[in-house]
Amino acid sequence: MVNVVLAGGGTAGHTSPLIATAMALQERGATVSCIGTPRGLEGRVIPEAGLQLDMIPPVPLPRTVNADLFKVPARLAGAVRKAGEVLQRRQTDVVVGFGGYVSLPAYLAARRAKIPVVIHEQNAVPGLANKIAARFAVFVGTAFPDTPLPKARFVGMPLRSQITDLADASGQARAERCARARADLGLDINRPTLLVSGGSQGAVAINEAVVAARTRLLADGVQILHVLGPKNIRGATRITDELTGASWLPMGYVDDMASAYAAADLMVARSGAGTVVETATVGLPTIYVPLPHGNGEQARNATSAVDAGAGVVVANADLDVERLLAETARIHDADVLAQMSAAGRGLMPAHAAEEMAVRVISAATSIDPTIG
């Protein structure tokens, strides 16, 4: 029996591929547990997925030079110590990290204990934790080709079975999934449907642009499933156009994004790695609005899908009512949507979770995980 500890959290961009890989490992007989921090989304979604979760202290890195920067070494040392205790208690054979500030203590604790480390990097531009650990990891899998990490191997994004099942559905089966998803969400099954989401935390710029354009979209007969983010849902209630009957349906968070994707004809979203890969894989045409902060990874994430014709990019600064209405007008052109959908399907490997599971078990059993 192989004991695997997976580390990653903060947002759905880290937790979703972690959970997908964990499920694939369990299917192969591995004993799986996870490491997270109290600050991240993992505190809810990992236990809900039926996985065991051990908590360690968070060690966020300040974006500017301030007093908190000088506290990082002591905080990191404490988190590494706690992670080491978890690895020892779990009798860990291999650590799998998905980036984010929870991963670095787990990586360093594993290295100290001489436990092999396997990495998955979700973004086209790698984060700091994975950059550090890639130097001593036995296998580095990436969601995008040409990610600049040592020993990187393009495997795709680990996706949960709900996403891969939707990706595999076509024709009548896909149409039935669409109708069922719309009905379950309280939407009209026959109406053009726009899905809007700024990721697990929401996105103010996208939310404001869509709300400003809402009246005109509804008057045009487009219904909107708007995932505002848990911090932005307060006071938001369903709005229906009296003449067209089209509705704006606000939600704080959607646990089953596969159903939201199935219900939609077109999406407006940030270009987090998970969103880009999932929308391309299921063939959902998407208008990507990259987060303008950070190291530019969101703009890079969208490149492959946009170059293939599966989506378009609108800069955050350019997103206003008129631009949004111009880009979403394609929702009425079935031929354009079909072309974009076809361009996305097959662009990314749909079964990366299974490949990652094979590599992880190989690393734990002293088989070279880079072979094959």
Curated annotation (Swiss-Prot):
It is an enzyme of class 2 (transferase). UDP-N-acetyl-alpha-D-glucosamine binds at T11, A12, G13, N123, R160, S200, Q298. GO terms for biological process: carbohydrate metabolic process; cell division; cell wall organization; lipid glycosylation; peptidoglycan biosynthetic process; regulation of cell shape. It holds the Pfam family Glyco_transf_28. It catalyses: di-trans,octa-cis-undecaprenyl diphospho-N-acetyl-alpha-D-muramoyl-L-alanyl-D-glutamyl-meso-2,6-diaminopimeloyl-D-alanyl-D-alanine + UDP-N-acetyl-alpha-D-glucosamine = di-trans,octa-cis-undecaprenyl diphospho-[N-acetyl-alpha-D-glucosaminyl-(1->4)]-N-acetyl-alpha-D-muramoyl-L-alanyl-D-glutamyl-meso-2,6-diaminopimeloyl-D-alanyl-D-alanine + UDP + H(+). One of its GO terms (cellular component) is plasma membrane. InterPro entries: GlcNAc_MurG, Glyco_trans_28_C, GlycoTrans_28_N. The keyword Aminoacyl-tRNA synthetase does not apply. Pathway: Cell wall biogenesis; peptidoglycan biosynthesis. One of its GO terms (molecular function) is UDP-N-acetyl-D-glucosamine:N-acetylmuramoyl-L-alanyl-D-glutamyl-meso-2,6-diaminopimelyl-D-alanyl-D-alanine-diphosphoundecaprenol 4-beta-N-acetylglucosaminlytransferase activity. It is found in: Cell membrane. It is a peripheral membrane protein. Keywords: Cell cycle, Cell division, Cell membrane, Cell shape, Cell wall biogenesis/degradation, Glycosyltransferase, Membrane, Peptidoglycan synthesis, Transferase. Its EC number is 2.4.1.227. PANTHER family: GLYCOSYLTRANSFERASE, UDP-N-ACETYLGLUCOSAMINE--N-ACETYLMURAMYL-(PENTAPEPTIDE) PYROPHOSPHORYL-UNDECAPRENOL N-ACETYLGLUCOSAMINE TRANSFERASE 1. Cell wall formation. Catalyzes the transfer of a GlcNAc subunit on undecaprenyl-pyrophosphoryl-MurNAc-pentapeptide (lipid intermediate I) to form undecaprenyl-pyrophosphoryl-MurNAc-(pentapeptide)GlcNAc (lipid intermediate II). Belongs to the glycosyltransferase 28 family. MurG subfamily. This is UDP-N-acetylglucosamine--N-acetylmuramyl-(pentapeptide) pyrophosphoryl-undecaprenol N-acetylglucosamine transferase. It comes from Cutibacterium acnes (strain DSM 16379 / KPA171202). The lineage of its organism: Bacteria, Bacillati, Actinomycetota, Actinomycetes, Propionibacteriales.
